[in-house]
């Protein structure tokens, strides 16, 4: 029987993207235009990278659905999406809110009522999708500024997969969610001074 040669690929190999979600559940009725988010990020010393196809009209629109925002060349961008109650993704909105509400109400913790009230009053939520195999500390900080923008400007409450929900005033974890896998989750970056 002939031997079958084993061929190995040298050099760096791309890992399969591993999606990681962070969200802000917002009570405000309308989402701010993306242009305000971009200005907020610039004010923090970041240089948001946006596709040249994104024009002023889109950046000034209140009715946006999603946008990829890069934080560093050579790194995958963060996908910032908006899911609205009663919008085109209403079914997704209802499923996500209902699923989280069921979990929160089934697990009695000291502050679960605060999370349940936030979810019941939620008009839209922002879901940031990150690739855990490609993000750096700089990317986590950049993502935390995006979360902070919506938390501050839209009466939001931050939720991070595998961690939980955070108090909007203190930044403290107030309701813990189970880990999403065996890997340790990154700590929530500390609140940046405004």
Predicted segment positions?
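Acidic (Asp/Glu-rich) sequence patches and key acidic residues
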Residues: 1-194
